[in-house]
A protein has these predicted regions:
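Surface-exposed peri-terminal alpha-helical interaction modules
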Residues: 1-117
Length: 117
């Protein structure tokens, strides 16, 4: 990530617009997984993960997600993009997907803190 001073206002506003959509989606997804994971119902967990990916595809189709790559780690951004064309088929896939979501959540918080400073 560049230093917050190196962004112009338009970049920051565009990032905030896209990140707020993704952040809302991410918050909903992580809450949903908190509900289904404790039940250890693997088919339900996989179904929810694929539903989440489908919803993500809708959200990103409506926005310029590329702006996120200017703010978050490039490797994490690429993982995020890769998941959009993927289908979760087993628990290992889900664990990798969930790990990416947690990293994305952490990254968004770090960016917000840096932009606020």
């Amino acid at each position: 990530m560049k230093s917050p001073d190196s962004y112009n206002l338009n970049e920051i506003l565009e990032y905030k617009e896209v990140s707020s959509l993704v952040w809302k989606w991410l918050s909903d997804v992580l809450s949903k997984f908190e509900e289904v994971i404790p039940n250890c119902d693997v088919p339900k967990i996989i179904e929810e993960a694929n539903n989440c990916i489908s919803t993500l595809n809708t959200i990103t189709a409506l926005s310029d997600q590329h702006i996120l790559s200017h703010f978050i780690d490039r490797e994490l951004y690429q993982d995020f993009i890769d998941w959009q064309s993927y289908k979760v088929t087993d628990l290992l896939d889900f664990c990798n997907f969930y790990s990416t979501l947690q990293s994305l959540s952490k990254s968004f918080l770090e960016v917000e803190n840096e932009l606020l400073d």
